Amino acid sequence: LSNRELVRRHFLESPLVKSETLTYSKTDEDFMRKLDEYIMHNMEQADLSVDDMADEMCMSSSNLFRKLKGIIGKNPNEYLRIKRLKRAAELLQQDKYSITDISLLVGFRSPTYFSSCFKKQFGITPTEFLEGGGD
């Protein structure tokens, strides 16, 4: 695997690795920074959509899809879910909120679905992460 692919995989599979670790061109870096800021400020909205993100980025949904796929290898919905799960891992580390509260804070309507997505993404449940299983 190429170094870029290894870094991308590490970002996707590790709960606390931030997207800033990925290497981009200056244009892509600015694009990702703006998108990440928008996601962070709107994360609680369970109905945040690809169309919302595309509108914020002044592009069509299909162009957003192509752009993200080219930069990080994920579509916008996958990237949004990953950003939500990574934010959840940060909140879990703070030990201030329950898993249910965190699931709602990051935009999941169902704590059960949140736990399922967390395990699928990182290989451990939120409870296991709290017990020291996270990176």
Predicted regions located by residue number:
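Short helix/strand-capping hinge loops at secondary-structure junctions
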Residues: 42-47, 75-76, 96, 125-126
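Short hydrophobic/aromatic patch on the recognition helix
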Residues: 63-68, 113-114, 118
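Residues within the alpha-helical elements of helix-turn-helix
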Residues: 56, 105-106, 121
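Residues within the helices of the helix-turn-helix
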Residues: 51, 77, 100, 116, ...
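Residues within helix-turn-helix
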Residues: 51, 62, 98-101, 111-112
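Terminal helix-turn-helix DNA-binding modules in bacterial transcription factors
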Residues: 70-109, 131-135
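…primarily DNA-binding HTH/wHTH and HhH modules…
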Residues: 116-135
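The C-terminal output helix
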Residues: 1-13
